[in-house]
Amino acid sequence: MIGILEEDELSSVKVLAFFFFQIRHIESSIRAVKAILAMYPKDIWARAMLVRCFDALENYQSVIDVTDDMMLFDSNPEIKKSMALLRARAMQKLGRNEAVRKILSEIGMN
């Protein structure tokens, strides 16, 4: 047991969230991911999936809000970089070009 759910139960909820995302039932994916985050607030996979869902809905302010603390992704450099890129895209969509340049510089893509 890893917490509130057994490990296989948590994996099942993650598979369900990803399935909903893949079939474009984004709101259902968000509900599943938020349930995971309610039980496991530091779950990097769930936080990243939430960002992807908001990006798919073109809810760029929510992408920015969820990625405000990029240190939450420090334990997984690949996820952190993809979240930084989605954050930069959201900033660009909202016309915050200086913030985009800063993010790209921080991840070595200037």
Predicted regions and their residues:
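Start-of-helix register in tetratricopeptide repeats
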Residues: S11, W45, I79-S82
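Alpha-helical segment of the N-proximal tetratricopeptide repeat
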Residues: D8-R31
